């Protein structure tokens, strides 16, 4: 029975899905599995949160010249990871996200960073660091998450190609030539997760800003129910459409992050 044109194209497309960044291949790579796998490795003393956080930051910095996925790197991530290791030694982990490397999109307020919205002009106009975290970032930290930094997006999260005037064009990890879009606007989070730099990260979604880059980069992107996740401390795009949620490589990991950030807005 002859196959349809759509089936033929689907088969051929797999031949070109070759990432230009080498994926983690060893089963012992702590960043290659799920969050549950990672925490099980910590419990076996295969690795520490500090070791894995250093590896995540090293990968991100080594690849960022090509990927343009990260706007700003945290200078407190290693301290957060070491604090998690201390809690682990005393059997006082806060939950499944404790010690887990995570990112947040550039439109989120993050203590100690300017909120640039991935815009070069906005970064010039408002260069000062903000004094507090957005509610979602604060909840990630309260859960013990290690925040690696802020990921690039389309300027002000208004487009769908991952084009930032601050960091440049975010690159799709499956495209050697730089022709295929990573999608947007939560492009940097999707790419960082896809490449095994972080387990999950925060994004926003009005008309597909999480779901589109998730599809293009082969990860999970969620648009939660409107109002499920608080929006305080995040640059708004469309007040009656804005939803915030996770991107991750695995559905279970996205669910863990959503569980940590969901709840009433205290503002």
Predicted features by range, described:
Residues 26-28, 223-267:
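A short helix-breaking turn/cap at a secondary-structure junction
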Residues 37-44, 124-128, 242-249:
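Short, well-ordered beta-strand elements within core beta-sheets of diverse protein domains
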Residues 1-80:
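An N-terminal boundary/leader segment
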Residues 98-244:
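Short glycine/serine-rich loop/turn segments
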Residues 33, 47-51, 76, 131, ...:
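Conserved active-site and cofactor/substrate-binding residues in soluble primary-metabolism enzymes
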Residues 43, 57-65, 82, 86-89, ...:
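Sec-exported extracytoplasmic/periplasmic mature domains
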């Amino acid at each position: 029975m002859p196959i349809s044109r759509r089936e033929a194209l689907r088969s051929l497309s797999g031949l070109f899905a070759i990432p230009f960044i080498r994926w983690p291949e060893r089963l012992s790579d702590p960043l290659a599995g799920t969050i549950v796998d990672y925490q099980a490795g910590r419990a076996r003393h295969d690795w520490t949160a500090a070791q894995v956080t250093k590896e995540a930051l090293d990968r991100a910095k080594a690849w960022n010249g090509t990927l343009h996925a990260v706007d700003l790197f945290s200078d407190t991530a290693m301290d957060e990871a070491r604090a998690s290791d201390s809690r682990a030694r005393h059997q006082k982990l806060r939950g499944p996200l404790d010690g887990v490397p995570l990112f947040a999109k550039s439109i989120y307020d993050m203590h100690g960073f300017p909120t640039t919205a991935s815009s070069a002009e906005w970064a010039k106009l408002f260069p000062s660091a903000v004094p507090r975290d957005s509610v979602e970032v604060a909840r990630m930290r309260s859960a013990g998450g290690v925040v690696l930094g802020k990921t690039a997006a389309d300027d002000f999260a208004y487009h769908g190609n991952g084009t930032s005037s601050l960091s440049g064009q975010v690159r799709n990890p499956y495209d050697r030539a730089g022709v295929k879009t990573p999608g947007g606007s939560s492009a940097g989070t999707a790419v960082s997760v896809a490449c095994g730099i972080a387990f999950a990260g925060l994004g926003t979604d009005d008309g597909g800003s999480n779901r589109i880059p998730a599809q293009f980069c082969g990860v999970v992107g969620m648009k939660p129910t409107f109002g499920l996740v608080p929006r305080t401390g995040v640059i708004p795009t469309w007040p009656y459409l804005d939803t915030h949620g996770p991107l991750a490589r695995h559905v279970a990991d996205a669910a863990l992050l959503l569980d940590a950030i969901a709840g009433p807005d205290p503002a």
